[in-house]
């Protein structure tokens, strides 16, 4: 049994080591050979049955002709002798056991048990094959018995020739099938060969050029899918290279400044070095802490962007009002000199809680950064339609020029006025990435068009559904109730101005988006 299993595994290894072209060709040959064998067998059986049936018909016709002519009764010897000039053997046995025979040269009509039973009258008729002859025995009404036989050698010769013809034709058919299968396989697998060469080229040279697509069959679709994979790989490498380049550039500046300040601090602490004034020492320490915080923020933003690019989004039901509340608590700790006016509704979204929290926090941070001390930031979350919620974060800062509204969502982009302020240039890029991953839309408008400063309002449209009443009440009870929630986030106010419309607003700047399935 072990030896049999080993042989089976060896056979499987040998089969799997064959190329796809050889396997397809062998499969075609096997199928054609099977069809040829079945067809040859069917032809042989049909022709053989027809020939032997024809011999039986001939014997019966001869017997009926002799019986109908009456010559067997008038002159049986002459009647039987006349059959010698044909291709049959004949024998007549009378009741008195007189026997008349006429045989072909070299042949003798065999008489066996079946024929003897007919002669004795036990059987009316019998047919059988014996000694390469087909024998017919008939018991006549006058108690005579007529036996006629015919040699099967001519028929067997025909069948032998037929076997050879079928063998030769079948072999030629299998050979032609092998050649045709090889040609068809080569032509059919040519696109697969191109795909293989392209994959090897990518692995060897990092060449991501697409493969030409011919036709519209399954292999063409496979080629198109491979080209899509190549394009996605090229875009991923481009994004990775751009991210590494931009990150290196953005990290170099704070690291250089941090190194300079640290070296200055170390030098000032040397035994014989002149001591810096206390105010300068405090400023240096504050600068070092600020630069460390800037580096931490930049690294965190890079990690968030990398995670969003990889598509590692965990979908779970999220209460957006809870996300809004937690983000507001964090941004208030950073900018307690800004007054936040918030109006929120219960809204449930299926998505990434961490990503949405990061996006909302970045929107509020951005609005607070551009607001003067004592300024006001308005945050409104309202139902836009039965399946979408609109989040609006508005400030009354200097605003964003129309020509820069697309650029502010690009990675590391910072306008001329923003370069003097702290930040990595990644905050709004993270917002855009999170909104896209959740199937949302983004647009930018002036908060107060025609007024100086115009301010900035960023509109976010996200899919979802109203928060179920029972679940929302539970969350409210869990977080000290709706009244305490309003006390935490400040009084709820209605944002001034007419309601924004994502489709008909005059100052809409579309940002790249992609649709996503709302869960």
Curated annotation (Swiss-Prot):
Q: Give the record's membrane topology.
A: Multi-pass membrane protein
**Membrane-crossing residue ranges in chain numbering:** 27-47, 164-184
Q: Tell me the disulfide pairings in this chain.
A: none
Cytoplasmic side stretches: 1-26, 185-519
Required cofactor names: Mg(2+); Mn(2+)
The record's section on PROSITE patterns has:
HAMP (PS50885), HIS_KIN (PS50109)
| Chief location category | membrane
List locations, semicolon-separated.
Cell membrane
> Under which name does UniProt file this protein?
Signal transduction histidine-protein kinase/phosphatase MprB
